[in-house]
A protein has these predicted regions:
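Bacterial N-terminal signal peptides
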Residues: 8-17
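C-terminal, non-catalytic "cap/extension" segments appended to globular domains
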Residues: 24, 28-57, 64, 224, ...
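Short His/Asp/Glu-rich catalytic/ion-coordination signatures at enzyme active sites or charged loops
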Residues: 42-57, 106-125, 148-190, 249-289, ...
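Active-site-proximal, well-structured secondary-structure segments within enzyme catalytic domains
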Residues: 161, 165, 197, 204, ...
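Catalytic Zn2+-binding segment of zinc metalloproteases
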Residues: 308, 505-517
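Short pre-active-site segment immediately N-terminal to the catalytic Zn-binding motif
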Residues: 482-501
Length: 713
């Protein structure tokens, strides 16, 4: 998942004069001794002063940066010269550099090194940031200038990328309340302010439940667990002052392997219930009431703009265009997915019965018996595969792929060359391997720890641009791998290896940018997962398998027969994977397509899943009380379908590589991919970009073939 953690404020404001890339700018900077606002110094065009982050400076920095930012906005809005692309749209691109730098630090505190002290400040800042955004979106004079450029004669004479920049600026106002007046205008601002606080509270409640619930087990409760998990759990327990025990933390990276391998059914149930009850424990961290208020406020807000529901507003400028199109795709896949689940459950039940387990398959059994079926049917042991999946070697494999496709070379920087925010973080310089030109830096924060949110994500501290001189990229990937004992290799699951490649795809999307204006580094939500999903396919290429999937003890490459088993099992468990995702995506769309007055979130979730005939042996990937994608901000609200929308493109593009003379490393097709689908970022309409690559629109058949489902007519 890409989540740059600059909060919804930064995401929304990017299209109208808030540069959130942290780009250095001597001209539009503020004069301040506050380290969080200072120009970035040092090599590589300057880098964040992560080693000087001072939480006490955060609130004063926001107050100063927002005030100076609004003053610069007023200068543009009150310019007496006739509005032009240069004095309005480009002028807006120059505003917000210090605030962009500040949001880079804010994102680190929020996602990587959060503390109770920060979360208190975050709660105070959220409504202030919302008010700041509203002052920009409701600046009538500024919107008038933007609209004049958008509707004026100059528009036709602009380059295509400049036209798109102008369109994005116009939509940033028109779709966010700029046309409202009087009481409606005031109410819109009040809703945004309240939502900002609710989103922050929701996210902090989930994090509190993740940090507050840890299961400690003893030696006699380790049956079935791999040595790598046991060692990591021992380290996690020691870090929490529970020497001699083993900690199962309340995160996916700990829950998933425990449910897959533990022979202790009662403990599996306990871990499952704890994980899927985050934000749903009837205490002061319970999110159900927040969900109802969030949905009602979103609905009220878009009604002020004239839309029937939130989903209609959200999808208007996405690839799907309207909710019906997104639902049509998901509902086309759903029947095949749940049919496969029923087959998978029957297979698992047969294995359990043959072993005399005397149980009915429940959600906390699914992963455990799925693994036994995999072993029985394909003679494939996931833990055996894991012995060949070393984190460091996977990173080298990603660098190899980047070199072949993008002509990038990654050079490790010595510790201390640039500041980092935690000792776990390492940094690489990225250069063009042919010319030697500097491309940017790549930061990696790989390990789970207290204060770091769960999951995996990518972000950029600075984006590529050239309109005021070239600025190079500062990109990062963040994961939650379980750190092993000192000196021991970090071994990961096949799914985690795919996720590692996925998030690196986001980083490559940033690093390959060739756009002129910073705003064009943004993206369309149901398209931005395409590039990252596509990069996952290179994990299974022969070049990666033969050279980087090597045994952590012997150094021997993964055996051909084990690779064959992996390939044979490629569509195994697609019922589970597709159904848990689609259930979340469908519920997201339904939440945002109704009038939520009087909503009971828990009842709505249960009733919606019942209407879908959701198999009882599976739970949604993200239950409503911890569905941070859609309730801790608005980035994925009515947009979680975007992963599947993007996967249609992914599967279709993958078939293009499979058919190419050089396969996945075909030089001509790789160049076409980078030029048309990576480097252009959001400078071109995504549908147009894909047609330039493929020669046609993507087709759903490739997706169905990928998952082993029947292809619809």
């Amino acid at each position: 998942m890409k989540s740059n953690l600059l909060t919804a404020a930064c995401v929304v404001a990017t299209v109208f004069a808030l540069n959130c890339s942290g780009t250095v700018d001597k001209e539009a900077g503020v004069n301040s001794d506050n380290v969080l606002l200072a120009d970035w110094s040092g090599p590589y065009g300057g880098t964040p002063a992560f080693d000087k982050m001072d939480l006490a400076a955060l609130q004063p920095a926001f107050e100063q940066a927002m005030a100076d930012h609004l003053a610069q906005i007023d200068e543009i809005a009150n310019n007496q010269d006739a509005p032009t692309f240069e004095n309005t749209i480009v002028a807006m691109e120059r505003v917000g550099r210090p605030l962009g730098r500040l949001f880079s630090y804010y994102g680190i505190w929020s996602g990587n090194v959060s503390t109770p002290e920060f979360r208190e400040i975050q709660g105070e800042l959220a409504p202030k940031i919302s008010e700041f955004n509203t002052k920009i979106t409701q600046n009538e004079a500024l919107f008038t200038r933007v609209r004049t450029v958008y509707e004026g004669e100059e528009m036709a004479a602009l380059r295509p990328d400049q036209q798109r920049l102008t369109l994005l600026a116009y939509e940033g106002f028109a779709r966010n309340g700029a046309t409202l007046e009087g009481a409606d205008k005031d109410r819109y601002a009040a809703i945004n302010k309240r939502l900002a606080g609710l989103h922050t509270t929701y996210a902090n409640n989930v994090l509190a439940d993740e940090e507050g619930y840890v299961l400690y087990i003893s030696d006699d409760q380790l049956s079935g667990l791999p040595d790598s998990f046991v060692q990591a759990a021992a380290v996690a327990a020691t870090e929490r002052d529970h020497d001699g025990q083993y900690a199962v933390t309340n995160t996916r990276s700990s829950m998933d392997p425990f449910l897959t391998y533990s022979d202790e059914r009662e403990l599996r149930e306990k871990v499952w219930r704890t994980y899927y009850s985050r934000g749903d424990n009837g205490d002061d961290k319970d999110n159900n009431a927040l969900i109802a208020e969030i949905l009602n406020l979103r609905h009220e807000r878009v009604k002020l703009l004239g839309y029937p529901n939130y989903a209609a507003w959200r999808l208007e400028n996405r690839m799907a265009k309207k909710p019906e199109n997104a639902l049509e795709l998901m509902e086309a896949v759903w029947p095949a997915a749940i049919a496969r689940v029923h087959q998978e459950v029957a297979d698992m039940q047969a294995v359990a019965d043959a072993a005399g387990a005397g149980i009915k398959i429940e959600p906390w059994d699914y992963r455990y018996y799925m693994e036994k079926v995999r072993k029985e049917r394909y003679d494939l042991d996931s833990n055996e595969v894991k012995q060949y999946l070393q984190l460091d070697k996977l990173r080298e494999a990603m660098f190899y792929v980047a070199g072949r496709l993008f002509q990038f070379e990654f050079k490790a920087l010595e510790a201390g060359t640039v500041p980092v925010f935690h000792e776990d973080v390492n940094v690489w310089e990225v250069v063009d391997k042919n010319s030697g030109d500097h491309i940017g830096l790549w930061y990696l924060d790989p390990y789970a720890r207290t204060g770091k949110r769960s999951g995996a994500w990518a972000t950029s501290y600075r984006s590529h641009e050239t309109f005021d001189g070239k600025k190079t990229v500062l990109s990062s990937n963040n994961s939650n791998f379980i750190k092993g004992a000192p000196g021991a290799p970090v071994l990961v699951s096949w799914d985690d290896a795919r996720t590692f490649f996925h998030e690196f795809g986001h980083a490559l999307h940033s690093l390959s940018s060739n756009v002129e204006y910073p705003t064009l580094n943004g993206g369309v939500r149901d398209y931005t997962e395409f590039q990252s999903q596509l990069l996952e396919r290179w994990l299974t290429t022969d070049e990666v398998i033969d050279n980087y999937l090597v045994h952590h003890e012997t150094g021997e490459p993964i055996p051909a027969d084990l690779v064959a088993k992996i390939n044979n099992a490629a569509t195994f468990n697609q019922g589970f994977a597709t159904t848990e995702y689609l259930a979340s995506a469908l519920l997201d769309m339904r939440y945002h397509s109704i009038d939520p007055a009087g909503l009971d979130a828990d009842a709505f979730e249960r009733e919606a899943l019942a209407k879908l005939d959701m198999p009882g042996e599976i739970v949604m990937r993200h239950r409503s009380p911890h569905f941070g994608h859609i309730f801790s901000g608005e980035g994925y609200a009515a947009a979680y379908y975007g992963y599947m929308w993007a996967e249609v493109l992914t599967s279709d593009a993958a078939e293009a590589f499979a058919e190419a003379p050089g396969g996945y490393y075909d030089e001509a097709l790789a160049k076409k991919l980078v030029d048309n689908l990576f480097a252009v970022r959001n400078a071109i309409d995504p549908a147009e970009a894909y047609r330039a690559f493929r020669g046609r629109d993507a087709e759903i058949g490739a997706l169905m073939r990928d998952r082993g489902f029947p292809v619809p007519n």
